[in-house]
């Protein structure tokens, strides 16, 4: 069998930070203070967009333009919002709206609430007029159009692709000369079959740089190992000349330092670029370095470094770019699996959409970090970014936390629309060590069973390798065989749908992993179906069509016991808005996650924690507040990594059972309010005791700041009874009282049938906000310092 060693196994990091000097590149965040209003799909109701005699497509900057893209347009009656701002979050629900998008009133049935307009006014100083300016949007959903000072810049159909526009010649300078950015986003059509939101839901930037600069997203840092462990680092890039004169005799200097700024021995070098670069011309460069004693990046040791690239002209620094990156090698072996820096890792993964209560698709950076940290608690070491690239900030967070990523492009195809998205994704995230695979598609049913699928994937494999020779690519199939013949790594969505063993016999050199596998999860804290109210019990406690109980265990043990499989990603990590299958309205969100929508754990999270971490786990389910089921026989399960588990119910010892690795233990018992106690044994000795007890009504609150970053706090609330016992069915209203300087950014409770207001609407600034808890938990996302006062309505 052959070993596939990813050459120059990459590295990198990629949140770019820049020197703040005037001559250097400066990345200016322009999220605050935008004007927002709904437009319409009918041009006559869309502020007259495009109806002028000379419209924005007729003349470059027609004086007849009067719509929101015109600098003279009056937006004083519009709402003021800060980005990211997903305008769909505040829309009502409707049982006739899109099932896949969570029954929000957006889409082709709702022309009056599917188009969002954004405007921002800013000024530049006269001394800034010698710089180059790019306007960037990390994500606008979707079918966006962008103008600056009335000049139409272009647009992007997809909601998941970064946009960059040169706006240098269109700008005004001076304190009395305004500049106006206008953006129109149209969420009429869906790209996904899951909630996608609408509008500018990711960050916006103004990038100021010198006219001679390092081409954005083209500086690459590559690492290759050597026998002595030191390895080689190659840094390469492109210089572009945006001035009106020839440029020559430039110099590029590279320095590798620790995050604290300490130089790495052997981590400095320079190269002259003698070529004459014509206006709008380019020059490529590369530098090889042999740094000593590098600490390599891995899921267990996510070591990172700063690689600073300085561009000089006659000894004068004209630009400096800092790339935060990590160094590591990847080996994919068709018989033994994945190796990072020579150490074997099994993929313990989840698939993940990117939305959250109160924010929708416009997730704050702090919330992205919170979500990844919560997943890591339960042993997750890999996330597949289903089914589109994540935000740059989430990718950087994965670097710092040691979470590997399978980063996925939005749509399968080989034309400019598809490959342009793929190229932008790879260019943006090439320097991130967390990214281990590029995924070029997911469940393309129309071509999974015929030769076209094979041809498309072969082309995409070659295109991917031409864009990045250091990583392999994959594609996910739901059952059709043709699209998993040609990729570097086959991705299987569900072992019940794919003949994985047969493919192994037919293609023994193929590398493969489980790109999706069922968790079997249901509604957190629900053990009896209540589908009329949008809640369902976990499928794990009901036999599947093959007779299997505990489907999540079926998936893990299948991949665990086959060393030739890299591992698996469960569908999903968090619940997400939309796609509430198999339920319909009033359910509005999925229930596939091991964590609910807000990040509170379901029972399945503890199953994975028992299998994927070394910490002792002894988790009892169900809870013991099963009102209405008195006298019924209940199967009490325990998820554990102990050797044996002993169970006591209401003072009666039900015995001690051996734990089959990867499985649960079960004890039938008649339900009566009281106490369930589990005791776990290792090597015959008691190691851990867990208790679940029937609680009284909620009377107390545990308030925890689960994560704090950038002045934003994720505050989790747990409801308890008078004795301090968790109240697992409590749904009491909670009120957060905001003090001066505090803003509620969002709230949620993990209820997959949530259909009420989750944040103040634009223009509202309440002193208090009320949210019901759901099955003992709730969450508030607060911006601003100071104590937080949350009260319980008993």
Model regions: which residues?
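Extended carbohydrate-recognition surfaces in non-catalytic/accessory domains of CAZymes
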Residues: 21-136, 191, 197-200, 574, ...
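Extended substrate-binding grooves/exosites of carbohydrate-active enzymes
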Residues: 30, 38, 46-67, 72, ...
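Accessory beta-strand-rich segments of carbohydrate-active enzymes
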Residues: 38-41, 87-90, 108-220, 242, ...
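Short flexible loop/turn segments that cap and initiate beta-strands
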Residues: 73, 247-253, 266, 299-306, ...
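Short, hydrophobic beta-strand segments
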Residues: 167-169, 286-296, 666-671, 764-786
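Extended acidic/polar, glycine-enriched regions
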Residues: 174, 238-333, 664, 672-673, ...
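Beta-strand-rich structural segments
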Residues: 235-239, 634-640, 679, 710-728, ...
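Short S/T/G/P-enriched beta-strand
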Residues: 332, 613-635, 691-714, 720-723, ...
